[in-house]
């Protein structure tokens, strides 16, 4: 599924990275298109299911939404945040359910999955594994030249963008301008 191109006597790879920040009420998603060392944002945002009362209906909506995104953009990989230990076990279980739904949606469309811990994402983007969400969003805005008016209000979207960008950096092809 990885596409390759001959450019300037070099073989370069093209990737479409789907980043997902799983959640039970809001799911962040982002799509990055990379060719060699070039990276551009195809789409990013938050899928909102908070108005549905039934937790399983929310998971079903997230599953179908991700399948639609996969059908539209044909990502070559799903990069998803691995779960951290939460103080509230019930919260953690619900988030793990959302993570499982995202992974199942990708695998049902033959999209491979990679996981990154929140600390790894923060370290890759800011150089500090304990950076806060606003610091990560600020760095992504700089690296990806996102105009202020396009920055989302909900940080779930920039979290997903950070996960996708972290995977891009792991490919060993960063171009920071």
Language model region names:
Residues 1-177:
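Phosphate- and other anionic-substrate recognition elements at nucleic-acid/protein interfaces
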């Amino acid at each position: 599924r990885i596409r390759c191109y001959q450019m300037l006597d070099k073989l370069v790879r093209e990737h479409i990275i789907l980043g997902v920040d799983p959640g039970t009420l809001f799911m962040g998603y982002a799509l990055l298109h990379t060719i060699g060392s070039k990276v551009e944002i195809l789409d990013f945002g938050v899928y909102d299911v908070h108005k549905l009362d039934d937790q399983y209906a929310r998971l079903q909506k997230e599953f179908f939404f991700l399948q639609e995104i996969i059908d539209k953009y044909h990502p070559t990989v799903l990069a998803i945040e691995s779960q951290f230990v939460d103080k509230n076990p019930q919260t953690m279980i619900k988030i793990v359910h959302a993570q499982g739904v995202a992974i199942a949606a990708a695998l049902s469309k033959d999209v491979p999955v990679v996981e990154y811990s929140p600390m790894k994402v923060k370290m890759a983007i800011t150089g500090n594994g304990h950076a806060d969400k606003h610091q990560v969003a600020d760095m992504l805005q700089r690296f990806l030249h996102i105009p202020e008016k396009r920055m989302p209000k909900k940080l779930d979207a920039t979290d997903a963008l950070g996960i996708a960008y972290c995977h891009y950096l792991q490919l060993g092809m960063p171009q920071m301008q």
